[in-house]
Amino acid sequence: MMYKHVGDDARGSSAGVVCCVDVVDDDVDALLCGEDAGELEREGEPAQGSSPSSSLSCAAAAAAAADDDDEDEDEHGVHGEVVQVTPGGEEHCYDYDYDVDVPVGAELVMPACSPPRTAVHRPGWSESVSWILKVRSVHGFQPATAYLAVSYMDRFMSSRSLPDHGWASQLLCVACLSLAAKMEESSAPPLLDLQIEGTRFIFEPRTIQRMELIVLVELDWRLRSVTPFAFVDFFACKVGSSGRSSRILALRACQIILSAIHELEFLNHCASSMAAAAVLFAVNESPAAMSHRSSVSSESAASWCIGLTEERISSCYQLLQRALNATARKRKRHPMILAACSSVTSSSSRSKRRKLDGHFGED
């Protein structure tokens, strides 16, 4: 597969136009997700409305464009310059040459079927998630964008270890959030703008693009994950007495989910169980909103969707309680750090949510 790099943005914040010169069918099939590849293989006919060039990932094209600038570098290497910003406003530049794709030793690579996630295995996880939520709040991303970024980061770190440097985890955060924004948002911000003010390390766009490609390869190009937000509205309608109260429940459930993704164990649960537990938690927080129902339990919630079980919902519900209690304690100690967790909706719906807050008892 060959690419031709046409041009770059003046700031270097986005990759230039990449033209596909020669694409072989086998190469395209390898780049597609499993569901897309299945469509191509069905009766030997290509998927409707798709072409080889349109099936290529934007991140892959961007990374390929960046590769043209450094032909002598390793295919999966991350090389460049990192800028560290100190609290005093001074900037320190460091050159680095680190190959993320080649672990130092076999013991650094976890097996494909890794054990359940725990905070012990992920130092700095909470700080990384907080940064993603802060960027989501600044740019007005959808809640699903932040969740996908955290999910990509979790899947990557489940099979690949990073060096013990702050810039490595920060680079992974930026790359995962950039990929998630390209998947969920109608318009993803430039890579330089994605690194908001206050970010400790600032990376060149081409460095982020290389890391995006490494993440894509590690995730086997499967980015279309199911998120809990796909179930929230449906589950909220199951218990809401009206469209308005259902919307209020859905908003609160989304906020609960975003607050809970700091807990690694929460990601062990399937998306539907997360959504059911979050809606159940929102109902129990404001029972006045459910005047037409005497109570909603894990047992009744298990009937909302095929695959839900009372045990899974109860387990997820307990994690939500622990996560929200921990978040409340941290907010009391550091109110500014966790401010990003309080906003759930995008900027277009914030004014509407303010009108709905405090009126759970009205239908």
From Swiss-Prot:
SMART domains associated with the record: CYCLIN, Cyclin_C
A single BP term in Gene Ontology: cell division
One CC-aspect GO term: cyclin-dependent protein kinase holoenzyme complex
Composition-biased stretches (Acidic residues): 66-75
Gene3D superfamilies associated with the record: Cyclin-like
Domain of life, source organism: Eukaryota
Region (Disordered): 39-77
Biased composition (Low complexity): 50-65
GO MF annotation list: cyclin-dependent protein serine/threonine kinase regulator activity
Record key words, sorted: Cell cycle, Cell division, Cyclin
Family: Belongs to the cyclin family. Cyclin D subfamily.
Protein name in the entry: Cyclin-D1-1
Organism from which the protein derives: Oryza sativa subsp. japonica (Rice)
